[in-house]
Amino acid sequence: AKWTIPATFQFQNGIEIIVMNNAKIEASGTMTFIRNSMLTIMEKGEVNAEDISFTNGAPAALRNWGALTVANTMTLHSGATLYNKGTITSKNISINSNTKIVNDNKISLEGELNLPSNFSLENNGEIYGEKLIANSDAVATNNNIMKFTTISLTNTTVNNACSMEA
């Protein structure tokens, strides 16, 4: 099945969108998930969007076992969580404080990953990008591969058990 969203679309409080195996969402505008709404992409599910924004906070904003491609920016607002066991490709990921990313497969960025204060990153897969910027009170744990052209860390706790390159 394929769902084409022609413009900016907001998923209101309490909505969970589940993209099943071999299903696809094509969004030409911004997909916004508000409050406790969620996006779950199952294995072999696919979402393509211009922009995607999670304003909901807890519980998990995005759970991905499939493929998520964002042409511009994926935004995680305060309290949002991203669990990735699939593939995420985006120009940038914009993150507010008090958010969390757990990556168990692959995240590829054309631009930057900016880790604000009170942010937690657990990488058990692969993360590639142009620039990694981390600020005070951010915690990054790398158990596999992180490769960026530039890495800038300011008062950041980094637990590196594998390969972190700039």
Where do the PLM segments sit?
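Extracellular beta-strand-rich, repetitive "passenger/adhesive" scaffolds
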Residues: 1-166
